């Protein structure tokens, strides 16, 4: 096998709580993460030497500035791969959007290289490498519905929440995760998610309960600077969403809809706006 193609799925947060800040500067989180159907296409191929990263979108860094390059480099060092690797990314997930697009690409590179070079590494090994690349990469390797704790590396599987209809909206701003966390004041968080209630709703497939109780503590920081996030949340609710929330550090916002028809109607109502819009599903 000389090449392999993988789907790199985006993620949303169904909740996001920040518990505290560690001495090393990292924040302790407790959040529910969910894969969605929206994805990049990542093609990995063997080449004579070196690592080459290419992307069909000019604003996505190529070469060593791309997280996928870092993932490939770590794989080559860990498993002493002597030949080279070429990585082509067909970008569909918006960048700097709180959707783990870069992490998803890196996870695809780790999984793809394991298969392409017949490394036979188990998932735990791959996740260990992923952890060195970025906090969201281990989740992107596993995918599905997960409770994420620690700095994002402790993952506990939750029953699948697949097939839920989502409308995803990305305004024309990019948000730095580092900036959001550095401006988060833990003593000013007034509303935290009831994570146990949300997990119970997932177990019971109670979409309404989950949608109405989703909470992301980072919204307080990001919305203060980008009021458009609140506008999108309100617009999704006006168009029939059962609930809406910012994903990750933003600025993407999603709404949960009762059925595909309602999601498509909301998408039609939004798609001619100045925002990027997607109709998708949890997987």
Swiss-Prot record:
InterPro entries: GHMP_kinase_C_dom (IPR013750), GHMP_kinase_C_sf (IPR036554), GHMP_kinase_N_dom (IPR006204), IspE (IPR004424), Ribosomal_Su5_D2-typ_SF (IPR020568), Ribsml_uS5_D2-typ_fold_subgr (IPR014721)
Highest taxon listed in the record's lineage: Bacteria
Catalysed reactions listed for this entry: 4-CDP-2-C-methyl-D-erythritol + ATP = 4-CDP-2-C-methyl-D-erythritol 2-phosphate + ADP + H(+)
Keywords attached to this entry: ATP-binding, Isoprene biosynthesis, Kinase, Nucleotide-binding, Transferase
Known EC number: 2.7.1.148
The keyword Cytoplasm is assigned to this record: no
Gene3D superfamilies membership: 3.30.230.10, GHMP kinase, C-terminal domain (3.30.70.890)
Positions annotated as active site in the UniProt record: 11, 136
Listed pathway(s): Isoprenoid biosynthesis; isopentenyl diphosphate biosynthesis via DXP pathway; isopentenyl diphosphate from 1-deoxy-D-xylulose 5-phosphate: step 3/6
Binding site residues for ATP: 94-104
GO terms of biological process kind: isopentenyl diphosphate biosynthetic process, methylerythritol 4-phosphate pathway; terpenoid biosynthetic process
Gene Ontology MF, one: ATP binding
Functional summary from the UniProt entry: Catalyzes the phosphorylation of the position 2 hydroxy group of 4-diphosphocytidyl-2C-methyl-D-erythritol.
Family listed: Belongs to the GHMP kinase family. IspE subfamily.
Protein name, UniProt field: 4-diphosphocytidyl-2-C-methyl-D-erythritol kinase
Biological source species: Acetivibrio thermocellus (strain ATCC 27405 / DSM 1237 / JCM 9322 / NBRC 103400 / NCIMB 10682 / NRRL B-4536 / VPI 7372)
């Amino acid at each position: 096998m000389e090449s392999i193609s993988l789907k790199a799925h985006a993620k949303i947060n169904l909740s996001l709580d920040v518990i505290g800040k560690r001495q090393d500067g990292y924040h302790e989180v407790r959040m529910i993460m969910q894969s969605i159907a929206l994805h990049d296409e990542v093609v990995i191929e063997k080449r004579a030497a070196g690592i080459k990263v290419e992307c069909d979108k000019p604003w996505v860094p190529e070469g060593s500035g791309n997280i996928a390059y870092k993932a490939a480099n770590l794989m080559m060092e860990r498993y002493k791969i002597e030949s080279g690797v070429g990585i082509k990314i067909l970008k569909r997930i918006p960048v700097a959007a709180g959707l783990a697009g870069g992490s998803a690409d890196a996870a695809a590179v780790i999984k793809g290289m394991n298969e392409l070079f017949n490394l036979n590494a188990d998932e735990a090994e791959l996740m260990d490498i992923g952890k060195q690349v970025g906090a969201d990469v281990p989740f992107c390797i596993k995918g599905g519905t997960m409770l994420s704790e620690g700095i994002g590396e402790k993952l506990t599987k939750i029953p699948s929440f697949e097939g839920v209809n989502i409308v995803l909206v990305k305004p024309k701003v990019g948000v730095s995760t580092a900036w959001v966390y550095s401006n988060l004041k833990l003593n000013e968080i007034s509303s935290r998610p009831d994570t146990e209630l949300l997990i119970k709703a997932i177990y019971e497939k109670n979409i309404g309960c989950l949608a109405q109780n989703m909470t992301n503590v980072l919204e307080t920081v990001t919305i203060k600077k980008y009021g458009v996030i609140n506008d999108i949340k309100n617009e999704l609710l006006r168009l029939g969403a059962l609930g809406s929330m910012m994903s990750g550090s933003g600025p993407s916002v999603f709404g949960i809809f009762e059925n595909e028809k309602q999601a498509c109607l909301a998408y039609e109502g939004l798609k001619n706006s100045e925002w990027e819009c997607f109709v998708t599903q949890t997987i």
